[in-house]
Amino acid sequence: MPGRFELKPTLEKVWHAPDNFRFMDPLPPMHRRGIIIAAIVLVVGFLLPSDDTPNAPVVTREAQLDIQSQSQPPTEEQLRAQLVTPQNDPDQVAPVAPEPIQEGQPEEQPQTTQTQPFQPDSGIDNQWRSYRVEPGKTMAQLFRDHGLPATDVYAMAQVEGAGKPLSNLQNGQMVKIRQNASGVVTGLTIDTGNNQQVLFTRQPDGSFIRAR
């Protein structure tokens, strides 16, 4: 048939067409023909018609029944059930009425405590302690031995006066030191014999004076 013989030369030309493509010279003939076939398949795939109809949403039977039940008007039995008044619940507790406030009741008066006046402890404040002078001891050493500040002795030495009783201590002399509750030296007496004593007292400014 003439049509068959005309188609065969055309197919042969198409089959050998890749041999004339210079940019495919590095590839073997079979690879060239494979590339041409793949290109033809892609073109045919693009040209085929596609199904553009959107997928219709699937409505379940339950959704249809819900829509139908909502669209129907309520029956008389449903309306009667809504109009029935609820019965009292026995579990509900009735509100408790507040107790009335009785007038005339005396208010509770707070208890008052009597505060006692401050009484200073005379047994601790201004307490005198007696010390006997040992051989070779000075007044400053006597203070140090009993944990008292020697600076008080130096302050009293500035007003020592006649006879210098602080500097001329004798063995066996009796010395009395007075301290307040805080342990501060507030007075000092030295027995000078013949029932006579020398007295030093502290002033409010911290200095000492010889009282007698």
Swiss-Prot record:
UniProt GO BP: FtsZ-dependent cytokinesis
Primary localization: membrane
Comp. bias intervals (Low complexity): 99-120
Effect of loss of the gene: Deletion of the gene has no discernible impact on morphology or cell size. YtfB/dedD double mutant grows as filamentous cells.
MF GO annotations: metalloendopeptidase activity; peptidoglycan binding
Residue span of region Disordered: 88-127
Region (OapA), start-end ranges: 117-212
Keyword Membrane among record annotations: yes
Protein role: Cell division protein whose function is related to the generation of a transient cell wall structure. Function is linked to the late stages of cell division.
Additional remark text: Overproduction causes cells to filament, most likely by disrupting FtsZ ring assembly.
Entry's free-text remark on domains: The OapA domain binds peptidoglycan.
Name assigned to this protein: Cell division protein YtfB
Species per Swiss-Prot/TrEMBL record: Escherichia coli (strain K12)
Gene: ytfB
